[in-house]
Amino acid sequence: EISECLVGSEMCIRDRGYRTTPSVVAFTKSKERIVGDAAKRQAAVNSDRTIFSIKRHMGTDYRKKIDGKYYTPQEISAFILMKLKEDAEDFLGQPVTDAVVTVPAYFTDAQRQATKDAGKIAGLNILRIINEPTSAALAYGLDNGMAQKVLVYDLGGGTFDVSVIDIGDNVIEVLATSGDNHLGGDDFDERIVNYLVEQFKLSDGINLSKDVSAMQRLREEAEKAKKELSSSVTTNINLPFIAMSKDGPHHIDITLSRQTFDELTADLVDRTITPVENALHDAGLSKTDINMVLLVGGSTRIPAVADKVRQLMGKEPSRNLNPDECVALGAAVQGGKLGNQLQAGSAASEIILMDVTPMSLSIETMGGIASRLIERNTTIPTRHSQIFTTAGNFQTSVDIKVFQGERKFTRDNKLLGNFRLNGIKRAMAGVPQIEVTFDIDVNGIVNVSAKDLGTGREQSITITSSSNMTEEEIAKARWEAEIYSKQDEAYQSFIDIREDAVKTLNEANNALAANKKVWEKDKKKNVKAQIGHLGKLISKAPIDKLNEEKAASMHEASEAVKETLR
């Protein structure tokens, strides 16, 4: 979703002189739909019919019920895009049909697909989806052609992204990206709201948290206070008639200092540290390798945020670009290039963007293993194929399950989608050759196909917005991948032992059948006994209940069978 509307590389000045559009949609009681500043202004008196921060719900099954109709995130986002489209058409005096849309770098495949769907609903042909930090780097690179490595720190209203980008020789290459899709300026506002609620409860004995209208007024004042504290050390919050009681009307009149605000939000600022460190690590760089730190997003105006970046990176961040507008500026330049509207030979027309996929993609193989085909921070577009085979004898179909995440086992990752490949030629386990291909386009949208190389049969799936990873799940996946890595490795060894035991059991059964008339009676009896013992151990050790003791028993029995068969 976009918050600014641009034409060429010039900001589109809307009616009333505004340069940005709040992502707010409201429905009046007379069933009119309003978007942007007007929707935001009426929120206090119409809070239950006003929708904020829809970006956080993209790609989920969230629904908003208004007048008996359920609206999807795609539809609500489309209303915002329609408003931007109308503003651009008014500014240009001609129809607008194509657009480049920016999204948080950590948006999942489902969220990107949902964004494309919103564009379609709005009547726009989405030429390209660009990651917001990449778009900001494009805007920065236009006037800074020298080779350099840039860290883009993008803290917006609802999301946080950080990307490490290499700029040079007319190429803008994303080396790594990280982020938190549930951290932004809205969370800073909420801390002020909670503080005001607690202070009012202490002073007046009234809990405002259940009063929808009062809470909306608090949110509006909290946002104003946050902005004022970016340039002042104190601000006054005055809300007359915020509540009524038997004693009469109650008012809020509180002075909030920047120091108190910083204390209320210190943990939010600290949450940006780990994504920065992760991005640097994945890029193979240290903070001393970074030539420039670019602040993007209105929330980077918070002094404590800039101080943290300065402390973390050891250098003064750049303020050359307007943090509210640079993402849209980069998108406009890319749109001009894709639409062949840039002057030939200009710096903008020569620039090439190379972005990455934010999370690893895998399929489930025997034992619940997440077999990765594409690693996180792989440059897109990309295509990768790998040969797999069947796990059972005479198997005529396979289920392909696609996962996103960084853990070794699929149970700890997010299922994106699944499909079945039928018509596999009957054969012993391990004989069929099944080619699985992952294809990620320039928008970061995934297509997965599976082909039986023996029969030529093929099946594919494009991951849609019905399946997705939430913001919390992505952050949790990255965190757990590091915390539980040793635990995962240990369990992986148990899985390997079990799979080896199953393979040995199959080989022993096949050998017994093939040598029924050759082996002596005692050897056949011994092999049958060992097969029975190993089979029981395997059956008592399902994959989800493995432990060190069961793995050791299977390994010992498996080795005994191998020794007998030698």
Model-inferred region functions:
Residues 3, 7-60, 64-70, 79, ...:
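Oxyanion-binding/catalytic loops of NTP- or PPi-dependent enzymes
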